[in-house]
Amino acid sequence: MYALLEAIEARARMNRARVAMGIRDPNPKTLESAWRAQVLGYAQVVLVGDKKEIDRIGTDLEVVDTKDPEKVLSELLVSRKVDAAIRGTAKASGTLSNLKEALGMKRVCRLALLLTADETPFFLAPVGIDEGNTIADKLRMIILGAEHIRRLGVEPVVGVLSGGRIGDLGRDRRVDRTLADGEFVAARALGLGINAKHYTILIEDAIKESNFIVAPDGISGNLIFRTIAFLGGGDGLGAPVLMDDYVFVDTSRVGGHFTKAIMLASALSYLHKERKKVIR
């Protein structure tokens, strides 16, 4: 897994994709992180936001002037005027709703890539608060996530989490349900040819043996993401929406640094191009 980041960086530099980044309430740190991605050769970055606000801070990057970056990001992506897009500091709900409408999607499925404090990379799903709330949702995420992880040259090892230890059965109905769901989901994934194991609530054990952590639901997944990226000394590279025809990487506005998310988007764009060559 440690070689994963090197592979992502190499593919980003080979591709140097045209990557759009949503901008709201720009600040020097945000614009500097976008500029750094371009200087490092990861991408040609296009800022999408209010040009007057951006110009007050100053940047040499290309700017698409709009007061509605949430909508324009999707338009640029669908029209192929950019190779990939990241949410940046655009609003989450507006960006994702516009993306779903533009692409005719009923729901989105995201797979976050994080680094622990000791720089161990791993994938995490679900991360949206409204995602992964049913067994069917979790299985869909595992199947799609495993497929995309393999495209990066990594064999997925799934660690399924639940709300307690096996010895906690009978203490609480909700905990009992998550334990039963965890057992079923892990067994079903195994039956589909995906290496998976139910680790109950023991995330500290799961991270030692797995590279793809599946949280009990989207709320707990979002909390895991925020704890690692914003409190625990780790980092979040972004959460790509799992789809075949376009590359969109969701990001959190909190951290303010987007260099690695741009790198990831450019690398995924490269992989999509290579995959299309094989299909043809």
From Swiss-Prot:
Question: Which keywords, in A-to-Z order, does the entry hold?
Answer: Methyltransferase, Transferase
Q: Which GO terms describe its biological process?
A: methylation
The keyword Repressor is assigned to this record = no
Q: Does the keyword Transferase apply?
A: yes
Any one GO MF term held by the record is:
methyltransferase activity
Q: What is its EC number?
A: 2.1.1.-
Q: What is said about its interaction partners and assembly?
A: May be part of a complex composed of 3 subunits; MtxA, MtxH and MtxX.
Q: Which family does it belong to?
A: Belongs to the MtxX family.
- Protein name per Swiss-Prot or TrEMBL: Putative methyltransferase mtx subunit X
